[in-house]
Amino acid sequence: MVNIHMIIGLASVAAFLLLTIVNGLRAFRGSELSWARGLSFAAAGLLLIQYVIGFSLLGSDHGMKPIHYILALTAIIPVGAEHMIAAQETDKQRAHRTAFICNLATVLILIAVYEIGQRNA
């Protein structure tokens, strides 16, 4: 189960990294990439799967440093902000910038979480 958690964790980091690049292109170059919203929901879905597997591992007494759990749960904030704040923004350019900033924050958090998990697996 730990290996699956690590694989999906890496996929989550990759998905949010790609999403950050896509939203950066949308925000700063004006590119219209219609599939960005689908990618956003797919990345969030991977993160949800990570939480389910992570709580399963936590329930089975798998040892991990508390900072791993704290940072992992912190990633909910920028993901939620992207889906809530950016989606309600009427100015497209501002919505894309907000999504980019939220995705960048998520990527940085997830890289830290993944690295902690990698070192303590």
What does each model-found stretch correspond to?
Residues G59-G63, A81-R97, E115-Q118:
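Membrane-helix boundary connector in multi-pass membrane proteins
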